[in-house]
């Protein structure tokens, strides 16, 4: 008999995504949701009923916490006394585990699984897959996983569950929790999201200065495509001399000399503290 999974936050946006994919598996799933809105969403969209926490945790093998980072510690502390040794607690983000918000239970297995989301450069041909920017639906995406604590053989179970909830899968990478924290919030949010926000503000500024919005958007997104393909080695090539000169003078104008320190452990820890 396949393992029993308790999905907490099953009626949230992420929870419903996971519940939908779990329906395609052989896992035995119990759904837990406290809000009436979430219960209704789960019922309306997937025809699923929620159960009590006690029923969900009875002989459970894997507990998935599809809840906000800010309450993971609280929920984990509440359910920990009801979990038998060897139970896996899975979080969908490294923030709370990195911050030490999980209970001090050496006899539990802690597993973290986070999606990479569909790549900008991909080979999807189906229109639905090409429009699946988030992943877990039609487009393939890679995933990252970490076994924070627990027996080595537990990794296979955690990865197997992760491959189901985030399917379809392109590649699967095993990392440490610290490495996952470098990727998020470090690389994906502090760096990527911030610089994308700056690019959007820059585009808006060209519009304010008279460039038609559609022209500015096409120009920026098109250049992001080719420049990204070159700099991430998707295609052979090099930037023009003029472009390299613009980077040489533009980078110090835009970036502090010590920007790379956002990856220092203290900075990552402080960033996580702010969101948990």
UniProtKB/Swiss-Prot annotation:
Free-text function comment from the UniProt entry: Involved in catabolism of D-apiose. Catalyzes the conversion of D-apionate to 3-oxo-isoapionate.
Pfam families from the UniProt entry: F420_oxidored, PGDH_C
Residues the entry annotates as binding Zn(2+): 114, 184
GO biological process: tyrosine biosynthetic process
Protein keywords: Carbohydrate metabolism, Metal-binding, NAD, Nucleotide-binding, Oxidoreductase, Plasmid, Zinc
UniProt cross-references to SUPFAM superfamilies, sorted A to Z: NAD(P)-binding Rossmann-fold domains (SSF51735)
Pathway: Carbohydrate metabolism
Cofactor: Zn(2+)
Residues that, per the record, bind NAD(+): 12-14, 33, 69
Family of this protein: Belongs to the ApnO family.
Catalytic activity: D-apionate + NAD(+) = 3-oxoisoapionate + NADH + H(+)
EC number: 1.1.1.421
Record GO terms (molecular function): metal ion binding; NAD+ binding; prephenate dehydrogenase (NAD+) activity
Protein name as catalogued: D-apionate oxidoisomerase
Superkingdom of origin: Bacteria
């Amino acid at each position: 008999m396949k393992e029993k999974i308790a999905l907490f936050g099953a009626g949230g946006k992420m929870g419903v995504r996971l519940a939908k994919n779990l329906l395609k598996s052989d896992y035995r799933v119990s759904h837990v949701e406290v809000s009436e809105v979430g219960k209704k969403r789960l019922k309306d969209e997937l025809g699923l009923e929620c159960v009590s926490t006690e029923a969900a945790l009875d002989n459970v093998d894997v507990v998935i916490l599809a809840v906000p980072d800010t309450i993971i510690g609280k929920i984990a502390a509440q359910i920990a006394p009801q979990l038998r040794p060897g139970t896996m607690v899975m979080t969908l983000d490294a923030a709370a585990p990195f911050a030490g918000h999980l209970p001090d239970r050496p006899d539990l297995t802690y597993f973290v699984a986070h999606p990479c989301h569909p790549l900008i450069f991909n080979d999807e041909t189906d229109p639905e897959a090409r429009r699946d920017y988030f992943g877990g639906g039609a487009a393939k995406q890679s995933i990252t996983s970490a076994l924070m604590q627990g027996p080595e053989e537990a990794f296979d179970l955690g990865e197997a569950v992760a491959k189901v909830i985030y399917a379809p899968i392109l590649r699967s990478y095993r990392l440490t929790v610290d490495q996952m924290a470098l990727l998020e919030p470090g690389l994906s949010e502090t760096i990527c999201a911030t610089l994308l926000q700056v690019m959007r503000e820059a585009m808006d500024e060209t519009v304010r200065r008279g460039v038609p919005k559609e022209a500015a958007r096409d120009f920026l997104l098109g250049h992001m495509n080719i420049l990204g393909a070159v700099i991430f080695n998707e295609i052979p090539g090099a930037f023009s001399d003029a472009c390299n000169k613009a980077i040489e003078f533009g980078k110090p104008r835009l970036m502090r000399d010590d920007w790379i320190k956002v990856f220092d452990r203290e900075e990552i820890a402080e960033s996580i503290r702010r969101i948990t």
